[in-house]
């Protein structure tokens, strides 16, 4: 596409090429993790959770009173969650964050003695853990599934998930540019359209 349009620079084409290149970079990183097996995959997604949570907290206003809650989130809950995934303790890693951490973090937040926007601040840390750690940790947790006749090949489930998700992202962009008319959430994502979303989901489902 770039070769055919070399005489006519296009921001849309440049964006698409950038997305595809990012796709290959991510595919390469996941591939390297696969070489190291279970340890590599769990370690990779633990790092992804760490960077995602760090970015989330950076974009979320916090106060000095949140120090102990954030300390627990980064240095206790996150590594504990992935440690449980490593050991395959399903009953614990499915409850650690949505139950135990949700109860303990508000208590830790009170130690700082700061009551300003207390509930809002606590909720942000809680849901940061849910999105960035709990949800992401369930990708390597696929390694713990025991599927009859599929023993030793659980890495393929993660590979399939990554391929479908990345393909959906690229295809949503393509469909959005080809047939996009109605924006989903203009203030949140100016380029996401209803048509692109539907086209991307349906196309990825065919995979």
PLM feature spans:
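Membrane-embedded alpha-helical bundles of polytopic integral membrane proteins
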Residues: 1-207
């Amino acid at each position: 596409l770039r070769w055919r349009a070399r005489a006519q620079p296009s921001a849309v084409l440049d964006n698409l090429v950038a997305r595809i290149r990012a796709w290959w970079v991510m595919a390469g990183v996941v591939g390297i993790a696969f070489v190291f097996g279970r340890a590599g995959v769990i370690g990779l997604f633990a790092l992804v959770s760490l960077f995602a949570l760090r970015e989330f907290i950076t974009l979320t206003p916090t106060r000095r009173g949140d120090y102990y809650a954030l300390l627990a989130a980064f240095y206790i809950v996150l590594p504990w969650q992935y440690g449980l995934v490593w050991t395959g303790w399903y009953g614990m890693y499915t409850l650690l964050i949505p139950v135990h951490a949700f109860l303990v973090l508000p208590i830790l937040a009170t130690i700082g003695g700061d009551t300003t926007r207390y509930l809002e601040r606590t909720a942000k840390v809680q849901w940061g853990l849910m999105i960035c750690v709990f949800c992401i940790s369930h990708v390597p947790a696929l390694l713990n599934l025991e599927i009859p006749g599929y023993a030793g090949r659980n890495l393929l489930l993660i590979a399939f998930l990554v391929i479908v998700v990345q393909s959906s992202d690229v295809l949503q962009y393509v469909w959005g540019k080809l047939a996009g008319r109605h924006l989903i959430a203009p203030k949140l994502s100016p380029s996401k359209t209803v048509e692109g979303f539907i086209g991307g989901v349906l196309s990825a489902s065919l995979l």
